């Protein structure tokens, strides 16, 4: 007669549970109905993709239609390539506090709908990012309940890429096709297998 639960099964269960705990994907949390106009965008460039170069600034802004000056806090979490929380401690990827209050807010006046507008710039006097990677920005209320999350990317340019576009040398395709050539200058960055890594 077989044992219903052996030491081997117990070890396998513990191992699987530990993988589940350490590889939890941080979900994108949708904001409640009173939170509107959420934007997370770079401050220097004129596009809305939340992607910045290491050392550049990104800004979060949103409106709370309750209009009652809530005490919101933010937390920045470093993630791996698959948006799983990384095992890196905050002191390795941040200078300053990983959580703090959102201190910049203004109440609307002379408007049909009352609201409070909140803004957060990163870096700020209390925090700066010192490591490239994927990040989750969490916003919580004064009861530490998660209100919403936003993802952003911080990158470090390690190679330069040049591109040139030329008309096709084939006469039949001269007006409809192009040749595109890329040049990757790796500098001191080591690439072992260009076919897979570029």
Language-model-detected regions and their locations in the chain:
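Ligand-binding face of N-terminal immunoglobulin V-set domains in extracellular IgSF glycoproteins
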Residues: 114-127, 132-139
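Low-complexity, Pro/Ser/Thr- and charge-rich linker/hinge segments at domain boundaries
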Residues: 154-177
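Short acidic/polar inter-strand loop motif in beta-rich domains
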Residues: 81-83, 127, 141-147
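Proline/serine/threonine-rich low-complexity linkers at boundaries of modular beta-sandwich domains
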Residues: 26-40, 159
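Contiguous beta-strand segments within globular domains
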Residues: 36-78, 172-186
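A short beta-turn/strand-edge loop motif at beta-sheet boundaries
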Residues: 66-70, 128-129, 189-196
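Extended, solvent-exposed segments with strong compositional bias
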Residues: 95-115
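Bacterial Sec-dependent N-terminal signal peptides
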Residues: 1-25
């Amino acid at each position: 007669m077989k044992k219903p639960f052996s030491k081997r099964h117990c070890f396998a269960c513990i191992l699987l549970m530990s993988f589940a705990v350490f590889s939890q994907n941080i979900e994108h949390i949708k904001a409640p109905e009173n939170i509107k106009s959420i934007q997370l965008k770079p401050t220097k460039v004129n596009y809305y993709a939340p992607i910045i170069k290491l050392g550049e600034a990104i800004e979060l802004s949103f409106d709370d239609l309750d209009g009652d000056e809530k005490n919101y806090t933010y937390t920045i979490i470093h993630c791996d390539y698959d948006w799983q929380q990384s095992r890196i401690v905050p002191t390795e990827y941040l200078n300053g506090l990983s959580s703090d209050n959102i201190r910049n807010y203004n109440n609307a006046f002379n408007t049909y709908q009352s609201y409070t507008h909140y803004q957060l710039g990163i870096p700020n006097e209390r925090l700066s990012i010192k490591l490239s990677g994927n990040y989750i920005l969490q916003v919580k209320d004064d009861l530490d309940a998660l209100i919403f999350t936003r993802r952003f990317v911080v990158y470090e340019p390690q190679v330069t890429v040049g591109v040139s576009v030329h008309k096709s040398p084939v006469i039949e395709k001269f007006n409809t096709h192009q040749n595109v050539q890329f040049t990757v200058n790796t500098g001191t960055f080591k690439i072992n297998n260009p076919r897979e890594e570029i």
